[in-house]
């Protein structure tokens, strides 16, 4: 059995979608002839134990608390006081400090202990290949230095692009240094991996000579093996889990659509509810604007396991994306949970792109980009719910999006670069 050293900062995280791809690949690589040795930071998270996966914890100094103020966002309006103004100044100052000192990311102090632990493993075990996954990009810096020292084949998995990530807004000075660092880091990489074909073409613009392979994610069937809906909802229940990225993912189309359908007497205001699990970016204020505050329930962040439980007990799962052309390259990991839960999907986002193509290919629901389309989708789901025939309609293509197939593709690439 061959061995791959896997630099994966988020392996143990249980509140983010990133860990699902990492753990899924680690779990199923042994089925295709590769045993992973996963390098992770020692944090408060418990180590996830998976058969045939060796996890090595390293020392880790957290930097983020030095630069990021604790959030006190309750979703309620507050009067602006002198103290608020001071806090805003402090927040901006900390943000600027982060631009300077948290370069290339706030996990930079993990690089040294992770590199040293990796060297020890390589020198004492037969490591055939290296994989690194971002974010954080520090993972790739570690792999780059290992590649330089040992000349072992290396795959860099970019779950999100580095400099071409529209969700990260650096100043022009930081952008200059980031791009230079990306070019230097990937100079000796064997294969760059993205999550979609569009992301591959985008990355090709700055790495035209590199081999780039799109490897989509998927759902792990075992996560859903013993899960089932435990209650019947008295209202059509829509659910969204995750971040709204400070308004980039805007639920206005959803709220406006529900409001219009209620005003048109097409749906009963007392027969629909929307649950949000995650951050609270303007949700309360926005729901009041559209007069549906009684229909919108705002909850805090929960673990991935809790997310799946709530998804199983919801009727329709929401995906809300940024209404920007750059969003075309993304497929949010949550869509694979929708397939695993076998729940209908309502996706709201840019009019075209990877996500829309996937939803249409698999027939798992609707992808809409304006209020009229959204109203039609909600009304269709509402009517089917009232007639007790609302169900998941994913076709045979949906079953192809499994973590086992994702790991299989990584194993194929690993074999090709030996």
Please state what every model-predicted region is.
Residues 269-273, 283-308:
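Nucleotide-activated donor-binding/catalytic signature segment of Leloir-type glycosyltransferases, i.e.
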Residues 1-64, 191, 197, 212, ...:
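N-terminal subdomain of nucleotide-sugar transferases
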Residues 41-112:
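A conserved catalytic-core segment of Leloir-type glycosyltransferases
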Residues 24-25, 101, 138-141, 145-149, ...:
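Membrane-proximal helix-turn-helix segments that form the acceptor-binding/catalytic region
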Residues 198, 218:
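Carbohydrate-associated surface elements
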Residues 231-248, 255, 406:
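Conserved donor-binding/catalytic core segment of Leloir-type glycosyltransferases
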Residues 63-72, 219-234, 385:
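Acidic anion/phosphate-binding donor-loop and adjacent secondary structure
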Residues 249-252, 303-309, 317-336, 346-357, ...:
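Nucleotide-sugar-dependent
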């Amino acid at each position: 059995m061959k061995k791959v050293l896997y630099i994966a900062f988020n392996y143990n995280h249980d509140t983010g979608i990133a860990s699902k791809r990492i753990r899924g690949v680690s779990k199923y690589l042994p089925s295709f002839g590769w045993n992973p040795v996963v390098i992770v930071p020692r944090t408060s998270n418990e180590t996830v134990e998976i058969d045939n996966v060796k996890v090595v914890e390293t020392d880790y100094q957290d930097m983020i608390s030095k630069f990021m103020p604790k959030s006190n966002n309750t979703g309620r309006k507050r009067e602006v006081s002198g103290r608020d103004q001071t806090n805003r100044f402090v927040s901006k100052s900390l943000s600027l400090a982060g631009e300077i000192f948290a370069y290339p990311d706030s996990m930079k102090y993990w690089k040294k202990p992770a590199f040293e632990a990796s060297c020890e493993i390589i020198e004492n075990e037969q490591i055939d290949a290296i994989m690194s996954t971002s974010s954080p990009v520090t993972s790739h810096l570690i792999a780059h230095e290992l590649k330089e020292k040992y000349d072992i084949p290396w795959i860099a998995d970019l779950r999100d692009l580095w400099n071409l990530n529209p969700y990260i807004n650096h100043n022009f000075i930081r952008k200059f240094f980031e791009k230079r660092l990306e070019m230097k880091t990937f100079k000796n990489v064997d294969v760059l991996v993205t999550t979609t074909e569009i992301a591959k073409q985008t990355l090709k613009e700055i790495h035209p000579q590199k081999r780039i392979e799109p490897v989509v994610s998927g759902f792990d069937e075992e996560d859903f093996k013993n899960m089932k809906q435990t209650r019947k909802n008295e209202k059509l229940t829509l659910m969204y889990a995750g971040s709204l990225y400070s308004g980039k993912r805007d639920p206005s189309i959803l709220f406006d659509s529900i409001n219009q359908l209620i005003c048109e007497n097409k749906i009963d205001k007392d027969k629909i509810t929307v649950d949000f699990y995650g951050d609270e970016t303007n949700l309360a204020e926005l729901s009041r604007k559209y007069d549906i505050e009684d229909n919108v329930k705002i909850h805090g962040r929960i673990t991935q396991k809790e997310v799946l439980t709530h998804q199983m007990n919801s009727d329709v799962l929401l995906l809300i994306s940024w209404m920007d052309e750059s969003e075309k390259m993304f497929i949010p990991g949550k869509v694979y949970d929708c397939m695993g839960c076998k729940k209908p999907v309502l996706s709201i986002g840019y009019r075209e792109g990877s996500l829309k193509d996937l939803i249409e290919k698999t027939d798992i629901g609707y992808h809409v980009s304006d209020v009229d389309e959204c109203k039609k989708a909600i009304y269709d789901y509402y009517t089917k719910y009232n007639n007790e025939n609302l169900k998941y309609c994913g076709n045979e293509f949906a079953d192809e999006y499994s973590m086992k197939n994702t790991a299989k593709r990584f194993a194929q690439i690993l074999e090709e670069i030996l």
